[in-house]
Amino acid sequence: MTVKTPAELKTLYESISFDLQTTYTGPLGQEYAVSGTHLRLWAPTAQRVEVSLYRKGSGGEPIGTLPLERGQQGVWSIYLPGDQHGRYYTYTVTVDGISRQTGDPYARAAGVNGTRSMIVDLARTAPSGWERDVRPVIPPEQRAVWEVSVRDFSQDAASGVRPAWRGKFMAFTQQGTTLHGDGIHPTCLNYLKRLGVKYVQLMPIFDFGSVDEAKPLRRQYNWGYDPTNYNVPEGSYSTDPTRGEVRIRECREMIAALHAAGIGVVMDVVYNHMYRNENPLNDTVPCYFFRQNEDGSFSNGSGCGNEFASERPMARRYMIDSILYWAQEYHIDGFRFDLMGLYDVETINAVRAALDTLPGGRDILMYGEPWQGGGSQLHRYEANKANLAMLNERIGIFCDDTRDTIKGGCFNAREPGYVEGRPGSFWDIGGAVAAWCRSDRLPPHAPSQIVNYVSAHDNFTLWDKLLLVRYEKPEFTAADGTALAQNRLAAGIYLTSFGLPFLQAGEEFARTKKGKCNSYRSSPALNRLDWERAEKYHALVDYYRGLLALRARFPRLSSTDPHAPDALYFFSLEQPLVGWQLPAQWGDGAAWQALCVFYNPTETSKVVPLPVGRWQMLSDGISSSLWRGPARVYEHEAVLMPYSATIFGQI
C-alpha cells in the first residue's frame, strides 16, 4: 500500500478496511529461547524491514544486517538461531522509500539511552528469591499512597544511603538507613516502614529521554515524563546503564524490597505522549499511534507535541500489552495514568478488564488524572471527570475538587482554600468528606474512586502554597506556626474523608521547593527529599503517622460501598466550622462505635456541642495519637483549637 501525506495516512488508519486487514492478536516483540529467538514487528505500511545486530548497546558497527519476512496483518518476523541473550539490535523500516532506523517498540531491554534494543532472557535478570516475591495483601482501610521520584528518594547525602546507590533503584533495598548514619533518625525505606503508608507511587521508571545516561548525573535532572521505551526501566536509575540487563534486575530488586516491607508499588505510566516525534512507534508505522488533526499533523492534547491514539486497535493493544507486562514481570501493584483524560473510556475500561484476568489482578490499583494537557482530537468519550460514571468502579480519579476546596486553586498561588479561611468554602468540605457521593457535581460509582490529596509532584508543595497565600515574600525555609497548623488541618481533612488518601513525599515534613511550582527539570538539590528537614519537622511526621494508623482502625472511611457516605450526619455549626458523625459498619472491626470529627479553620478556639454519649479524644489537631494513651473522655461539649481537625471516637 502506498501513502504519501499525513492526511492520507489519517484517512487510511481510520478506515474499517485497514483495521480488518491489519489488526493482529499474535505475539509481538521478542520471543526468547536458549535455542533461538523470534523477533516480530507490526509494520503494515512498510515495504522492507531489516534488523541490524550489535555486540554492544552503543558504538561499533553491526555484526550483521538481515531482512525480515512479511507475514499476515503486516507483521514482519525473523528467527535468530542460538542463544541471543545480550544481543543488541535495531530495525530499519522503509516506508514509501524513506528508511528509518529505530528500536523495537516492544523492547524489554535496551542499551544506554535506549537507542538500541536488547534481546533478554528475563530469567537471568531475576534477583535472588524473585520467584517467591508476591504482591502484599493490603486491605482498603490501610491504603494510602505516597508519591516519590526514584531520584528524589535518596539523592540527599544525608540519607545514609551508600553513595553509589543514591538516586538509584538500589537505594530502596538498603536496610536500616538513618540520617547521616546516626542510627537514630530513620530515612528512606526505614522511614517508610515507620510512617505507615502502604503504597509508594513511583514517578516514571520506564526509559525516558530527558536525561543522558551516557553522562554523569551531577546536575542533570528530570521527572521523566518523556517516554522513550515503555517496557524498559530507566537506565539512569541503574548502577550501569550500559548493560541492558542491570536496570531490569535492579528495578526488580527495588520492588521486591518494598514488597518485603509490606509496601505495594504503583507505577506512574505516561502512554499519552512520547518524548520525541521520532520514536520507535512512529518510525515503525508513521502517524498510526498518534492522534491527528484534519491536515494530518499531530494533535497536541498532551501539551508535549503529540498524543497517543488509544482508540486505534493496535495502539489500544500496545497499551494493554505494556500494562500487563509490567504487572506480570515486575509484580506492579497499581498504575497511575498521567493525563488519563487523553484516553478513551473504552480503552481504559479494557485495561481494567485485562488486569482483572491476572491472578490477584482485581487488587491491582488503577487511577489517573481525569484531565488533558490541551485541546485534543479525541472524538470519543474521554476518560475524564465528566465521564466518571462510564468508568469501571475500580478506576479512580485524582479529585481536584477536594484539593482546591481544602487548600485553594493550584493555578493561582495566592488563592486561599478552606484551611486558609476562604469564605464559603465550608459548603464544599462536606462534599469532599463524602467523596462527592452525595453531590451532583461529581457522583462516583463508589467513594473508593476518589483519590483525595492536597499536593502532588505538579504545582506548589502544600507548604509553599500555604506560605504564598499568607505572605507577599515568604521565607520558605523558616518555621511558621500558623502554616504548620494549617498543614495539619489539611491532612486532617483528607485523611478523615471517604476515598483513597494520597500525598506527595515530604508533605508530612513541610517539604518546600522554595516557591517553584513546576520543578520537572530544576536542580537535584531543589527536588531531593531533605532528610534533615524530616527530622526537624518530626512532630508533623508523627501527626501524619498517627492519622494513617487511626484511619486504618475505622474501616468505613475506606469503604467501597457506594451508599456508605449516606451514613454521614453533618452538624449545624457556626460558619465556617464543619462537623460530622459517622457510625462504624457493624462487624468491620472498628476500634470505636462511631467517629465525630470537627474542622476549625479559624485563628481562634471554638466550643462545640458533642452528640449524646461518651467520646474519647483521638486527635486534638496537634497530636493524632492521643488514642494510643490514657483515654481523655468528653461529654456534652469540647473545645477546638485554632486551625485544627479534632477527632473523637465513641466508646
Feature-to-residue mapping (PLM):
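Glycan-recognition and catalytic regions of carbohydrate-active enzymes
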Residues: 24-26, 493-516, 528-595
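Substrate-binding/active-site clefts of carbohydrate-active enzymes
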Residues: 151-330, 339-359, 365, 377
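The feature marks proteins involved in alpha-glucan
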Residues: 1-34, 71-174
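Conserved, mostly hydrophobic/aromatic
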Residues: 41, 91, 148, 202, ...
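C-terminal accessory region downstream of the catalytic core in glycan-modifying enzymes
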Residues: 479, 483, 529, 547-549, ...
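Carbohydrate-binding surface patches
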Residues: 31-47, 569-611
